[in-house]
Amino acid sequence: MMTNVETVVNTHNGNGAIATKIGETQTDVAALLERLAALEQRVNELESAPGQDIEDRLSMVVFSGDLDKAIAAFIIATGAAAMGMEVSMFFTFWGLNIIKKQKTYEGKNVLEKGFTAMLPAGTGQLPLSQMNFFGAGAKIIRKLMNDHEVTSIEEFVEMAQEFGVRMTACDMSRELLGVRDEELIDGLEFGGVASFMGDAARSKASLFI
């Protein structure tokens, strides 16, 4: 008789444990479904957010004013443009020397005139980042490039403009270094860091040279 009672009790307890386990599982499933729904909503929000679309675009900050780095920057820029990518180059600080065409001292203060005197007046005066040897290194590289029929930096700049590469001169750097509009090559745009960031946010790749 006791055996039958124990069996009934054990059976009752077993059913209760099973019911409890089922309840816990249902709660876990409901929580998981809720998290999945929230995740799906977040993904949809990100996909529909303005300015988040990644385009076939390359954005580049050109900070250096060295000849070898300038050549590398324009090789990449023209190569990407030739492949159909939209390319933007943001020239800041010493990179402004690459897009100069002349020097002017008119209307500048003492510090601005000092920068103008010390900095290159264009691609023809750019130094090498290594082994410049007071300008001799740059001349040697130019001769080697000419001997091997390699495109010059001047030709690369023209090619980039022909390919529709967007070139922007940094407003803040121009103001700090006293660079005037008439000192820069034609066909440039002028803007601040927000201009570059707008392009970079939509680009597949961003480079700093």
Language-model regions, residue ranges each:
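Short internal beta-strands
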Residues: 87-93, 168-171
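Histidine-anchored nucleotide/phosphate-binding helix
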Residues: 71-89
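A short aromatic-anchored loop/beta-hairpin motif
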Residues: 154-163, 168
